[in-house]
From Swiss-Prot:
It comes from Potato virus X (strain X3) (PVX). The keyword Transmembrane does not apply. The keyword Ribonucleoprotein applies. One of its GO terms (molecular function) is structural molecule activity. Residues 1-24 are annotated as: Disordered. The lineage of its organism: Viruses, Riboviria, Orthornavirae, Kitrinoviricota, Alsuviricetes. It is found in: Virion. It holds the Pfam family Flexi_CP. One of its GO terms (cellular component) is helical viral capsid. This is Coat protein.
Amino acid sequence: MSAPASTTQATGSTTSTTTKTAGATPATASGLFTIPDGDFFSTARAIVASNAVATNEDLSKIEAIWKDMKVPTDTMAQAAWDLVRHCADVGSSAQTEMIDTGPYSNGISRARLAAAIKEVCTLRQFCMKYAPVVWNWMLTNNSPPANWQAQGFKPEHKFAAFDFFNGVTNPAAIMPKEGLIRPPSEAEMNAAQTAAFVKITKARAQSNDFASLDAAVTRGRITGTTTAEAVVTLPPP
């Protein structure tokens, strides 16, 4: 709310001076000074976007590249879903190596499909776009991510064991027509966040910030932080 203008008058003077507070709305509000009313809030439509999720423009560009690669148009969506489902098993980082060829891409390997995606956006952003689709797919077939146990997930949290899990509830992602079969539980969300935190901690332990490779500086260590130094207190399971 803008503060009201203040009026001051010098002693012995009949002239008053009105001082307007910076940011006060002009008497005639138009353009960028227009004041919204209730009708705007009840009728306006917000276009949801997230920098963690591939945009519709990104998908259009990827679609064009895939067409040039001879991915069949009538199974292109299924090829995308298959790739993202595969990433739920193996990961969606830039370093992840895709395995084999899916059944919907006309013999084009998942690695080539992923390489085309990376020309437009990150693989994880692409996977985030289809996270709700993969979530429903896994639940329908009772088929959790392949590496859930290796990542330290409990059996009751195993369906959350993929690194783009946050996309399941992101409003910028593509939602199946029937919606989510079930929303992620609070325990699953906590497990996914904990797993992400552990990965970051381990990655930090494997990196170094040495300015010199002289042994007097590195003391013969490859990494800058020992595993013990990288250990932090994690939230309870």
